[in-house]
């Protein structure tokens, strides 16, 4: 009973924290920032018009950047942005209302199953720059996943560019499921666990990838088919 009460308190605390973050914390990838400029550069130079954005947040970071770049440079394009958190998805729809059109889809859902998330017992927290208490992020991911549908089968089968900027613990499975469907992809937070397994995979399969641009915490790769 005590454990259930403790879990309930944590869930409630996380709920109100999410509401505040959705309203007050803009995304980190801004169009005028270093990562935003690289995204814009690679999209324009390579005419990347079919884009998947994993991790909408509240819409005011990478999603807004992608929308503006596409709208200002191409007559025809497609952007799909996915968010698993209902609170952030709702806020993104509100924040981006003035920019939305039929070529832009802000979707609520997930593209992997709960059993595709890592088991906390198999996570090397220290090597990944985490502490054991960060397992709470995984618990909250699972809680959110139970509330939304898997929309993977509703996605297009080919993309020109995918931005992998989703959950700390879902990112690798999402990457592994999708990287062969795209020409280019971006990795945000490359210094965190989010991209830890992804970068290991790229290093072990280096013939499949070409590093195009790299910043301290952001990289863009080309997929070699």
Q: Model regions: which residues?
A:
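A short alpha-helical cap/connector motif
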Residues: 1-186, 190-225
């Amino acid at each position: 009973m005590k454990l259930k009460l403790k879990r309930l308190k944590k869930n409630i605390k996380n709920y109100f924290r999410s509401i505040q973050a959705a309203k007050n914390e803009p995304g980190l990838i801004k169009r005028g920032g270093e990562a935003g400029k690289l995204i814009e550069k690679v999209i324009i130079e390579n005419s990347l018009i079919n884009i998947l954005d994993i991790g909408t947040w509240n819409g005011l970071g990478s999603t807004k950047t992608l929308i503006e770049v596409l709208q200002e440079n191409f007559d025809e394009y497609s952007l799909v942005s996915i968010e698993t958190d209902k609170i952030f998805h709702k806020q993104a729809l509100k924040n981006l209302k003035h920019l939305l059109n039929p070529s832009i889809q802000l979707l609520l859902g997930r593209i992997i199953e709960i059993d595709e998330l890592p088991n906390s017992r198999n996570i090397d927290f220290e090597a990944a720059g985490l502490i054991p208490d960060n397992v709470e992020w995984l618990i909250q991911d699972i809680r959110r996943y139970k509330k939304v549908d898997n929309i993977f089968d509703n996605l297009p089968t080919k993309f020109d560019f995918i931005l992998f900027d989703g959950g700390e613990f879902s990112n690798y499975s999402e990457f592994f499921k999708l990287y062969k469907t795209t020409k280019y992809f971006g990795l945000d937070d490359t210094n965190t666990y989010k991209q830890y397994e992804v970068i290991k995979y790229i290093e072990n399969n280096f013939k499949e990838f070409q590093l195009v641009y790299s910043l301290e915490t952001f990289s863009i790769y080309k997929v070699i088919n």
